[in-house]
């Protein structure tokens, strides 16, 4: 995983914010991918990856929980 993948993931969530169910699913998937990359030492800068992924918190959409 590269930082560009995280940036692209955040961008995709922003593009899907009008469908909160999809946006929330994408956000959960992005967080899991970032955590897995960090846990398996497959990212060069864990702090930057996490910081970039957390930018999804600035995207306004409802979070759906079942």
Where are these regions (language model features)?
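N-terminal acidic leader/helix
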Residues: 1-25, 63-64
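Short, charge-rich amphipathic interface segments used for partner binding and complex assembly
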Residues: 23-66
């Amino acid at each position: 995983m590269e930082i560009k993948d995280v940036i692209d993931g955040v961008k995709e969530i922003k593009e899907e914010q009008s469908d909160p169910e999809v946006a929330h699913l994408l956000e959960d998937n992005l967080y899991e991918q970032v955590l897995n990359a960090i846990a398996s030492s497959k990212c060069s800068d864990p702090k930057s990856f996490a910081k970039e992924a957390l930018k999804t918190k600035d995207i306004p959409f409802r979070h759906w929980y079942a």
